[in-house]
From Swiss-Prot:
GO CC terms, sorted: plasma membrane
Official protein name in the record: Preprotein translocase subunit SecG
Pfam name, any one: Sec61_beta
Role of this protein: Involved in protein export. The function of the beta subunit is unknown, but it may be involved in stabilization of the trimeric complex.
Length: 55
């Protein structure tokens, strides 16, 4: 008769949990607002460049 083991975990879920616990952020932490502001500033610079230096 097979032994009934009640301590078994869901194997694929355990691997994901272990993966996310070991993940580390190695890059610089940037505020999301800063990314938006940089994008807006770049768009303004490109539009001004098109006005002052038409091709």
């Amino acid at each position: 008769m097979p032994k009934n083991n009640t301590n078994e975990n869901f194997q694929s879920g355990a691997g994901l949990i272990r993966y996310f616990n070991e993940e580390e952020i190695k890059g610089p932490a940037l505020d999301p607002k800063l990314i938006i502001y940089i994008g807006i500033a770049m768009a303004v610079i490109v539009e001004l460049a098109k006005i002052f230096w038409p091709v």
